[in-house]
Amino acid sequence: QINVELKKLASQLLLSLRKYFEPVLFGSIGVLSFAPFSFKYALVVSYTYLIYKLFRSNDNRNLNNLFLWSFGYWAIGTSWIIVSIYYYGNVSLFGSILLFLILSIGCIIFFFLPILLLKRVIINKSNNLLLFVPFILILVEFGRYYFLGGFPWLLPGYIFLDTPYEILYGLIGVSGLSLLLYIFVASNVVLYSNKTYLLAFNIF
């Protein structure tokens, strides 16, 4: 009887850990798409997971999933800031970590929480995921430009460097290519939701 209870407790613990660790993991692997790793599909997987969890999953923990995914994305993607502040800003290690955490939390609050607001305002009035999700994400990206004076890190459009699509930079810019990626991952979610277990066209 004791062994059965311990197994149940261990199973519940693992399930709880997965609920918190999974969004962080999928957020952090998106960073692998950028230099020096340049594993392009990592960001596709990362954003496909995020959009599915927020707009198609029956999981009601939207705020939790969004916060943890965003923390994984920003904490890993901008962690180099700690080193820069510590070595070149004459700030203590504790101060560097504190400033990094403030930046990460600021990015999450001001550029990812609006996704939930826009979801309630727009998506609840229309089920056209393919049309509205890319619109929401590109709107958030423009907000990043405006509020942080062109904050250049972790923009999805940059992953098209060294691909056949880089010729489009001169035509539609980084934001245009970000929009292309958002449309692609939204297509993935639509196909998966319709039980079509074949990801959308090969973009790279």
Where are the language model's segments positioned?
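Short, Lys/Arg-enriched N-terminal segments with co-localized hydrophobic residues
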Residues: 1-4
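Membrane-embedded alpha-helical bundles of multi-pass enzymes
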Residues: 6-204
